[in-house]
């Protein structure tokens, strides 16, 4: 039902510049409205989740150098949760601004109960971070960025939750395109 491959993923190089270590890769199913067209797996044989062996298991005391030489990410085994989230249709909570669009508060992950964020949390665990104002969307409350969410790029020790909306979306993908 779900293919998971564990292997050594080489650091990503674009135009001859090494931009950092990728810990996992997964493709969402085709035809989801909140994803750009053409981001699903190129072939059926590539439909699944790929995890770097260094990112497997919470008792695997590994650290991986972060992009730009800004420090290390301590591996706690949450990469597979993040990547399966992509496989089940979830985007990053900042709506992939900077990857698939501008880096600003207008990008959405397509889930109503995740607050907007201007960008990923840069592997930090700053629980008071609030990068976007959106009072009207959240019943006269301006929510903080969800650095605890599995679909952010925070320290793995900080990741511990999906929202109810994210859970509902993953369930609908399991009952629909991934059934």
Where are these regions (language model features)?
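Metzincin-family zinc-dependent endopeptidase catalytic domain
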Residues: 1-124
């Amino acid at each position: 039902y779900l293919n998971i491959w564990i292997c050594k993923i080489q650091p990503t190089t674009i135009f001859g510049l090494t931009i950092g270590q990728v810990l996992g890769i997964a493709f969402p199913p085709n035809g989801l409205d909140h994803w750009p067209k053409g981001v699903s797996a190129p072939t059926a044989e590539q439909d699944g989740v790929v995890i770097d062996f260094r990112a497997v298991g919470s008792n695997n005391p590994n650290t991986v150098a972060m992009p730009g030489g800004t420090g290390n990410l301590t591996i706690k085994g949450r990469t597979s949760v993040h990547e399966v989230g992509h496989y089940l249709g979830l985007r990053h909570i900042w709506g992939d601004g900077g990857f698939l669009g501008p880096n600003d508060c207008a990008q959405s992950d397509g889930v109503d109960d995740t607050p907007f964020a201007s960008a990923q949390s840069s592997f930090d665990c700053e629980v008071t971070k609030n990068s976007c104002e959106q009072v009207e969307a959240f019943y006269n409350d301006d929510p903080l960025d969800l650095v605890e969410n599995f679909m952010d790029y925070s320290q793995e020790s900080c990741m511990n939750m999906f929202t109810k909306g994210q859970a509902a979306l993953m369930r609908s993908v399991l009952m629909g395109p991934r059934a």
